[in-house]
Amino acid sequence: MFLGPWPFSRLLSWFAISSRLSGQHGLPSSKFLRCLCLLALLPLLRWGQALPYKIGVIGPWTCDPFFSKALPEVAAALAIERISRDKTFDRSYSFEYVILNEDCQTSKALASFISHQQMASGFVGPANPGFCEAASLLGTSWDKGIFSWACVNHELDNKHSFPTFSRTLPSPIRVLVTVMKYFQWAHAGVISSDEDIWMHTANRVSSALRSQGLPVGVVLTSGRDSQSIQKALQQIRQADRIRIIIMCMHSALIGGETQTHFLELAHDLKMTDGTYVFVPYDVLLYSLPYKHSPYQVLRNNPKLREAYDAVLTITVESHEKTFYEAYAEAAARGEIPEKPDSNQVSPLFGTIYNSIYFIAQAMNNAMKKNGRASAASLVQHSRNMQFYGFNQLIKTDSNGNGISEYVILDTNGKEWELRGTYTVDMETELLRFRGTPIHFPGGRPTSADAKCWFAERKICQGGIDPALAMMVCFALLIALLSINGFAYFIRRRINKIQLIKGPNRILLTLEDVTFINPHFGSKRGSRASVSFQIISEVQSGRSPRLSFSSGSLTPATYENSNIAIYEGDWVWLKKFPPGDFGDIKSIKSSASDVFEMMKDLRHENVNPLLGFFYDSGMFAIVSEFCSRRSLEDILTNDDVKLDWMFKSSLLLDLIKGMKYLHHREFIHGRLKSRNCVVDGRFVLKVTDYGFNDILEMLRLSEEEPSEEELLWTAPELLRAPGGIRLGSFAGDVYSFAIIMQEVMVRGAPFCMMDLPAKEIIDRLKMPPPVYRPVVSPEYAPAECLQLMKQCWAEASEQRPTFDEIFNQFKTFNKGKKTNIIDSMLRMLEQYSSNLEDLIRERTEELEIEKQKTEKLLTQMLPLSVAESLKKGCTVEPEGFDLVTLYFSDIVGFTTISAMSEPIEVVDLLNDLYTLFDAIIGSHDVYKVETIGDAYMVASGLPKRNGSRHAAEIANMSLDILSSVGTFKMRHMPEVPVRIRIGLHSGPVVAGVVGLTMPRYCLFGDTVNTASRMESTGLPYRIHVSLSTVTILQTLSEGYEVELRGRTELKGKGTEETFWLVGKKGFTKPLPVPPPVGKDGQVGHGLQPAEIAAFQRRKAERQLVRNKP
């Protein structure tokens, strides 16, 4: 390939010696001999120079549109150009490239590859893995390197058999196996589209997976029609235990229709519900953009978006910038000629670029070390390289193969952006979690296979016999149930003994409790004259204690007191009606059964059960005593001031307590404000739960409740026999609504209705109409009133659950805690945070105003000029060698203005120029200014666009002229609006003029000439100068012009001008210009006949106004 300098020094030495000998001895044939030596040296001298290394980029560029969108010629040219500018490369050699086409059929592709032998020094490719092995053998025979990103066979990694082959990317099979091993997915299926390249890819992939010991259930080929795809999907469903489906076809994200149709039909067949994982194969071969890169194909296709939730996209990681960003930067720097936008280019562009840079780096290493390079030495010197490719870091391992990082991308079935979930480190073959979990359909990963599939030196046989497995599972189930039943029986016996005897007993007697102060014997202390205070002794390091007034510990009996001391704490006894409780043993057994259900109820807003009192014929529930008494007492105590935050805190405590009880399947059945107690920390707790269950357990009949007691009971329970005692979940919600009414108005249930309780109960039982309390909006926020009405809905199924009530109630306080202590602290903190909130609010307002100002500034001035002005920099004038200007005005504008009101003139110009502004938005032009009826536009500045400026202005002019033909004035619809348009191309200077209301202005003779072209034009015509016509003709886009002749231009003399009358392919209708008079001109104003209709209509309106 390259020869070092050592042969030439010996030959030159020999040549000098022969010359001296011939001079000494006068040999006649020495001259002839020297000539022969020179002729022999010429080719060697030619080889001794730094000949270019020609890289052949081989692929199916002409037979597959998706491969042609990779723009291999542009990618190769960009890589060669950057290599030539890279100062780190040895300058003793250079690179060239040639684009070589693979045949579309694999059977013929090898033959075409052989024909390329003499066309390149080394090859990037092939892209078809079907003949990689044969191509690598030929490369070894030719001593030419094969650098491929697509080859699958792991045998190619054997450098003894294939010394001239190297991978520019990690083996796709290594990447797949690394991911499959991590998730324990062994059983795979491979499906390909019916293109020849993908069929051979699928066969190679399946063979490679099987060589790794993994079971590949099916290898299928599908056409693009629905019937073929459905048949393939049915075969996959019938295959045994397939977990992962590898799709060898073009990705749906870059326009692959086959994969799109395949995933849509899989979604219809419920195969994207998490049973299978779909993995696109082609994205393993390039870096698919995902950061800030939404995919419109997912946005516009809801079915595909939902199906893509089951797809894991594994692609080359791009750390700093995506492929689209790197391509756009190269295009902006002018390194890429005019080509499609980056989102229309295949990311395979970057892989081709990286492969060429890969060869250049290897060549550079070889030449620096040895001064020469062969194909085998290139592969050898590609080991342990590291360089930055097109948009990612490229690294190689000790064998010279690429070890780039990959990333696993995922969606949640609702978004159209991909998110990175795991990094696949191919250097260690490990996965690193990136913080965002994979969203699997159904909420859990696809079922894993046995670990033996990925264990070395182990053989998996595919599982045990199903019948044997069922027998084993059944036997284990019987054994497990037997063990659990025996354990449950033992546990019940032990618990029963412990609950009746010992420290955990729940059946209490007079020996366990001490009753105090007979004045506490009224209802739950609601009307008790308890006098106590909480004295905090935090400073002394002791816990708070209760201090009582003298005489508060007067001895009492169980007959006249409900308060007692149990284990040093105050407790409340809820007494049951007198009755026959039976034998003490039955009481013990029943108490044990009930406590099994109630002992685990531990919640901040549920008053805990401490046990049952049974002695001297009395049975009672023992619970904690709450010093603040019941909610009913607090509401009726005028000394307690309650704001809405205080009320909402109490209600939220009640909601949380009832939510907890309902989660534990406990129906309260007796929920009232007097059954809600408040402790010393103003924490509300629900009590008396389970009372009805205990009545049923003891088979006791309850006294008939009074009408006042029934005001909290739901209507359906009032109407149902025995409903009051049974209760229901929906009935508890209704009772909560009545308590809400009590808290809001601080009054009894239905206190505003002014009716006796009995009549209220009768109306509740017999609707219509539905009878409910009436609460004024001034008592609570509208959201709370609405929630209360939902809770007391007549139909029980329409009432919300406490989970829904809790979620709604949280939003009323905007997520703030409603605990009383927290509320007090928040009030104190609010003063200190007010200033911060005010500053933040003002800062946000300032930022919004700044954005508005910047937006207005960029609408008035070019972006680059606006940025300079914002930075306080001086905007230097800028010269433009060639731009095209557009001028237009309204024919007869003076006459129209004279016949119109000022506001009508403003409306006319606003309507017309709004229409123009909408049109220029679709062209590469810049609106300079409007003065009166004059409209000025330029193209080619401030952003240069080559020679396109004339075409952009011409296209815009045709669009404007077409739109004006149908434009009507609001106040003069009968009068036509005609415009004259003038176009001219030439140099201008642009700059910002003035400090007050600065404007971006254009200067130069081109501006004057363009204005003259407009003023000398005719209505409904586009007057074009020779310079503009010349540019349009060079563009060869089919513009139709007519020669006007020589025209007198003020200050310019006479010049030859033209009319622009259309363009090939332009189908919009153009207005017909007025006829030209005998003098070759038309009027520059409105004709009397044109305004006669308007004058006649105006006179008629005046007559109507003057009529009495």
Curated annotation (Swiss-Prot):
Domain notes: The protein kinase domain is predicted to be catalytically inactive.
A GO cellular-component term linked to this record: plasma membrane
Post-translational modification: There are 9 conserved cysteine residues in sensory guanylate cyclases, 6 in the extracellular domain, which may be involved in intra- or interchain disulfide bonds.
Cytoplasmic side: 491-1108
Domain (Protein kinase): residue spans on this chain: 532-812
GO MF assignments: ATP binding; GTP binding; guanylate cyclase activity; identical protein binding; protein kinase activity; protein-containing complex binding
Disruption phenotype: Deficient mice exhibit normal retinal morphology. Electroretinography shows slower recovery of rod from intense illumination. GUCY2F and GUCY2E double knockout mice does not show any photoresponse at 4 weeks of age, rods and cones degenerate at about 2 month of age and the intracellular transport of some phototransduction proteins is impaired.
Entry-linked Pfam families: ANF_receptor, Guanylate_cyc, PK_Tyr_Ser-Thr
EC number: 4.6.1.2
Membrane topology annotation: Single-pass type I membrane protein
Predominant subcellular localization, coarse grouping: membrane
Cellular location(s): Membrane; Photoreceptor outer segment membrane
Subunit details: Homodimer. Interacts with RD3; promotes the exit of GUCY2F from the endoplasmic reticulum and its trafficking to the photoreceptor outer segments.
Transmembrane segments: 470-490
Catalytic activity annotation: GTP = 3',5'-cyclic GMP + diphosphate
Tissues/organs with expression: Retina.
Disulfide bonds: 104-132
Biological process per Gene Ontology, one example term: cGMP-mediated signaling
Activity control note: Activated by GUCA1B when free calcium ions concentration is low, and inhibited by GUCA1B when free calcium ions concentration is high. Inhibited by RD3.
Protein name from the UniProt record: Retinal guanylyl cyclase 2
PROSITE patterns noted in UniProt: GUANYLATE_CYCLASE_1, GUANYLATE_CYCLASE_2, PROTEIN_KINASE_DOM
Spans within the Extracellular topological domain: 51-469
